[in-house]
Amino acid sequence: MIDEILFEAEERMTATVEHTREDLTTIRTGRANPAMFNGVMAEYYGVPTPITQMSSISVPEPRMLLIKPYEMSSMQVIENAIRNSDLGVNPTNDGQVLRVTIPQLTEERRKDMVKLAKGKGEDGKIAIRNIRRKGMDQLKKLQKDGDAGEDEVQAAEKELDKVTAGFVAQVDEVVARKEKELMEV
């Protein structure tokens, strides 16, 4: 039972780190990255659809993205979705593809993006700590119910603390990498 609690906590913490990593890919860095369009939705036959499912996105140059819709009829819808998103980019339509040039970020904008990245990292760490707290509560309940001895529970709590510290460090590392990426000119 103790192993199940620790395993479940570790699985959930791994998922949280992955979610944080995914969340950070949506922050614009000044370099072309197809992942920045992950959250952009366009109306496709009346259904909001991610533009990443409606087109192929390639990076021909470090600061340019090419978006080639699978159906030419969806070109205008994708263009409008990108314009209306909060990415701060303006696509140009040449009839075949959309070209999106990524403008250089200003120093002030970079600092705002770093703050945003740190906030997302903090959200990830809070989620990990909440998972730890839930695991600790489950361990204490096991001990209270008499299903596990005090020594076993204390050892499991130490293990859970160690695992938690490792995952918090992973989130810090992911955020630090993103911060470094953002501050590169």
Swiss-Prot record:
One Pfam family from the record: RRF
Subcellular localization, as worded in the UniProt entry: Cytoplasm
SUPFAM superfamilies named among the record's database cross-references: Ribosome recycling factor, RRF (SSF55194)
Keywords: Cytoplasm, Protein biosynthesis
Highest rank taxon of the organism: Bacteria
Main location: cytoplasm
GO biological process: translational termination
UniProt key word ATP-binding: no
Record function comment: Responsible for the release of ribosomes from messenger RNA at the termination of protein biosynthesis. May increase the efficiency of translation by recycling ribosomes from one round of translation to another.
Classification via NCBIfam families: frr (TIGR00496)
Protein name: Ribosome-recycling factor
Organism of this sequence: Corynebacterium glutamicum (strain R)
